[in-house]
UniProtKB/Swiss-Prot annotation:
Binding residues for Mg(2+): 84, 86, 88
Pfam families attached to this UniProt entry: PRA-CH
Record-given protein name: Phosphoribosyl-AMP cyclohydrolase
Note accompanying the cofactor annotation: Binds 1 Mg(2+) ion per subunit.
Subcellular location(s) per record: Cytoplasm
Function of the protein: Catalyzes the hydrolysis of the adenine ring of phosphoribosyl-AMP.
Phylogenetic classification of the source organism: Bacteria, Pseudomonadati, Pseudomonadota, Betaproteobacteria, Burkholderiales
Family per similarity comment: Belongs to the PRA-CH family.
Length: 138
């Protein structure tokens, strides 16, 4: 069995990785341009995302790769990968399987909207729960 790790491609060097070797990533629905979520990638996650055409992130809390949908089935098929003008943010244009990107069971992680004024305002959930998270994660 070959246990050698294949070297990572040189194009990864164009990305401006932070001091922890990570880059912020925004996932956007390709068909609607809805912003679905924000996450992080390391070099291996970005390379695997491009190789598999499925979103792979890096979990800072678990300190490991996180294959989007590995537990929920709500995978993201990647249509495009873009790098911003400063080369320090990645944008994934994805097809969100089942329409649920958020662990709360919503379409987007950005479901809270600020309403009111600076002195009398609050964050309000404005998008519906599409599926109870207790039925998503077992």
């Amino acid at each position: 069995m070959n246990t050698e790790t294949k070297p990572l491609p040189a194009w990864l060097d164009k990305v401006r990785w932070d001091d922890n070797g990570l880059v912020p990533v925004i996932a956007q629905e390709a068909s609607t341009n809805d912003v679905l979520m924000f996450a992080w990638m390391n070099r291996e996650a970005l390379a695997k995302t491009i190789e598999t055409q499925r979103a792979v992130y890096y979990s800072r809390s678990r300190k490991r790769l996180w294959f989007k949908g590995e537990e929920s089935g709500h995978v993201q098929h990647v249509h495009e990968v873009r790098l911003d003008c400063d080369e320090d943010v990645v944008l994934l244009k994805v097809e969100q399987v089942s329409g649920i990107a958020c662990h709360t069971g919503r379409h987007s992680c950005f479901f809270q909207k600020f309403e009111g004024t600076v002195d009398a305002g609050d964050w309000v959930a404005v998008d519906p729960v599409l599926k109870d998270p207790e039925h998503i994660y077992k």
